[in-house]
Amino acid sequence: MMEVMDILRKYSEMADERIRESISDITPETLLRASEHLITAGGKKIRPSLALLSSEAVGGDPGDAAGVAAAIELIHTFSLIHDDIMDDDEIRRGEPAVHVLWGEPMAILAGDVLFSKAFEAVIRNGDSEMVKEALAVVVDSCVKICEGQALDMGFEERLDVTEEEYMEMIYKKTAALIAAATKAGAIMGGGSPQEIAALEDYGRCIGLAFQIHDDYLDVVSDEESLGKPVGSDIAEGKMTLMVVKALERASEKDRERLISILGSGDEKLVAEAIEIFERYGATEYAHAVALDHVRMAKERLEVLEESDAREALAMIADFVLEREH
């Protein structure tokens, strides 16, 4: 059996061809360059690979899901471009963000054109019921991404966010698109209703684990692995599961201290916040929740027939928690 990175490389190369084909006719040249900047900058392309693997795991040809795989990656890229503008982030995938190189107006257009091209990539597969069903899944994921971003922005003004609210936010902002990749891929592969539902659940679970692990790495990893200062989420005041849990469990004194550190921008105080997380088991709790979602994801794969594709999906689920950045 291949290693996870080899699997992702193989399937991402299959998706890349359709992605390039989908955006090749964008004009003028400036818009094309801005649109393809993050696509050519790298990234593991886990989402399109999951779409292709899901099609194969239900007995289909992964090529039948190539349009869906391309659409998912184009939507993901559009969301990154717009997120970087909203968050005023200047670096993405080790490269200057699109809005840094081409300005905000062109970056907005680049995101918009990728969003539009995503739907074109799906409907190029024809107008069969499978295509219509897959298209509906992709459309729904776009709505959820916007809702998730709005929830996340709203959390910046609140300190009473519950775990349930946080999980809803990361489901919509992150996991919904991953679930759409696996569900739409299974649809295009001709999966049964049970197989399609199982793969949607698998995608949702690894999507939630992915985001929680991201938050976890921010406080337990190192600057070299992260490519950014440890605890930068704390310095920026981002709401994470660890923040939610620490605020819920902490003494009044520690709660007030944590609140004063969150969003202060003072990296010197980050270590103190991490100590508060540790004191109340918030870091350990987040890791346990991520582990539980990976376990649930792998359990849902048992609905499928044994195959190399199913094994690859299980390996990717484990990989979500093995990565260091």
UniProtKB/Swiss-Prot annotation:
One of the entry's Gene Ontology molecular-function terms is: metal ion binding
Q: Where in the cell is it found?
A: Cytoplasm
Q: Which residues bind an all-trans-polyprenyl diphosphate?
A: 92, 173-174, 211, 228, 238
Binding positions (Mg(2+) 1): 83, 87
Gene3D superfamilies in alphabetical order: Farnesyl Diphosphate Synthase
InterPro entries on file = Isoprenoid_synthase_dom_sf (IPR008949), Isoprenyl_diphosphate_synthase (IPR053491), Polyprenyl_synt (IPR000092), Polyprenyl_synt_CS (IPR033749)
Give a Gene Ontology cellular component term annotated to this protein: cytoplasm
Q: What is its EC number?
A: 2.5.1.-
Under the subunit heading, UniProt states:
Homodimer.
What family is this protein classified in? Belongs to the FPP/GGPP synthase family.
Q: What is the name of this protein? A: Short chain isoprenyl diphosphate synthase
The gene behind this protein is idsA
